[in-house]
Amino acid sequence: MVVNTEKCIGCGKCTVYCPVRAISVAQRKASIDLDICTECGNCQRAAVCPKDALEKQTLEWPRQIRSQMSDVTTVYRGVNGRGTEEMKTNDITHRFKPGFAGIAVEMGRPQISSSLRDLEKMSRVLAFHGAEFEDLNPITSYIADRKTGTLDPDILDERVISGIVEAAVPIEKLRECVEAVIAASDDIDTVFSLDVISINDEDGGNEARRILDEAGIWYRPNCKNNVGLGHLN
């Protein structure tokens, strides 16, 4: 995003609509810090500029990634949004199978954002511990080597509102993966949420919960549940 300074009157109405605080006003003109801007387009969609001075610029590679990952109206490679439906549609997709656990590392949030370099740190950790990355996740499409989890080096300095690294691991590797992600969190400069996804046993038990409990790893008692209604008409 850029400001057309010939139109801008410096009213500052747009500044509060930037989720990463990239817009500032000085000498009666707004300006956008392009190092921080994630190209989400939120300032323009808010339609608060009385002079229509906020304009989308032509994005070249690798800056295009900012829009692809942060602008909710952008569809890239047939995938829109930060990630998949994860377990919410598992009764239809069968994305997560018995004997496996899903892991999702949700990085960045509005006002904070995340660099692709930090996202790569988590994808490398998961790859090292044998995780298989989700094909339909947009971050996966940027992974240059799935065996190592490394991203295309050209994109590492780009920033996005948020991104999710999605993967699945054999249930017996869950503990080491979770502990490795927690340890790696000391080396990232953003916030993140760690999700664990698993299928209940036939008796209603849950192996993933047992593993986390035995390891003394805290998790929230409330969770998302798939009750299997997706196949009903």
Protein language model features and the residues they cover:
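Short, conserved charged micro-motifs
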Residues: S113-D118, I171-A180
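Flanking helices and flexible, charged tails adjoining ferredoxin-like Fe-S electron-transfer domains
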Residues: N42-N137, I143-T150
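Short beta-strand-to-loop capping motifs
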Residues: M107-R109, E166-I171
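Iron-sulfur cluster-binding cysteine motifs and their immediate structural context
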Residues: V2-T5, I9, K13-L34, T38-P62
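Cofactor- and metal-binding active-site motifs of prokaryotic enzymes
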Residues: T150-E158
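Flexible loop/N-cap segments at domain edges
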Residues: R159-G163
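Long, contiguous binding/interaction regions
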Residues: I9, I65-G99, R124-A127, L156, ...
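Structural signal for hydrophobic packing residues in well-ordered secondary-structure cores
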Residues: T15, A22, Q44, A127-G130, ...
